[in-house]
């Protein structure tokens, strides 16, 4: 599901909100999650999951064109850990073949 599809689905399920209002709300939520992670924070949505940063250690990679080794710097990457309720619901749906 894309962001546009998510906005469309929410607008359909919440007819009292316009698509523009839903779009603005989704945009604000994503911006706030991004801002919190950018400042080193963690975002937890109970029952859904949590967003945090994980550090990837510096390593030696390879240039795919030449095969030459390339030193890659360490960096922080966003990480999502699903919550228990989300995991259980997904697993139950998959068991039913959805």
Curated annotation (Swiss-Prot):
Keywords carried by this UniProt record: DNA recombination, DNA-binding, Transcription, Transcription regulation, Translation regulation
Coiled coil, from the record: none
UniProt superkingdom: Bacteria
SMART domains found in the cross-reference section: BHL
Pfam families per the UniProt record, alphabetical: Bac_DNA_binding
Gene Ontology cellular component terms for the protein in this record: chromosome; cytosol
Official protein name in the record: Integration host factor subunit beta
Quaternary structure note: Heterodimer of an alpha and a beta chain.
Gene3D superfamilies assigned: IHF-like DNA-binding proteins
Positions of the UniProt region annotated as Disordered: 56-78
Similarity section: Belongs to the bacterial histone-like protein family.
Function noted in UniProt: This protein is one of the two subunits of integration host factor, a specific DNA-binding protein that functions in genetic recombination as well as in transcriptional and translational control.
HAMAP family reported in the protein's UniProt record: IHF_beta
Alphabetized GO MF terms: DNA binding; structural constituent of chromatin
GO biological process: DNA recombination; regulation of DNA-templated transcription; regulation of translation
InterPro entries named among the record's database cross-references: Hist_DNA-bd, Histone-like_DNA-bd_CS, IHF-like_DNA-bd_dom_sf, IHF_beta
């Amino acid at each position: 599901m894309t962001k546009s599809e998510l906005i469309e689905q929410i607008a359909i399920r919440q007819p009292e909100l316009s698509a523009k209002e839903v779009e603005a709300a989704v945009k604000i939520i994503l911006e706030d999650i991004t801002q919190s992670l950018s400042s080193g924070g963690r975002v937890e949505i109970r029952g859904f999951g949590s967003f945090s940063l994980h550090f990837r250690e510096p390593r030696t990679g390879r240039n795919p064109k030449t095969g030459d080794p390339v030193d890659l710097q360490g960096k922080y990457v966003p990480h999502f850990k699903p919550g228990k309720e989300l995991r259980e619901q997904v697993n139950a749906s998959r068991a039913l073949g959805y």
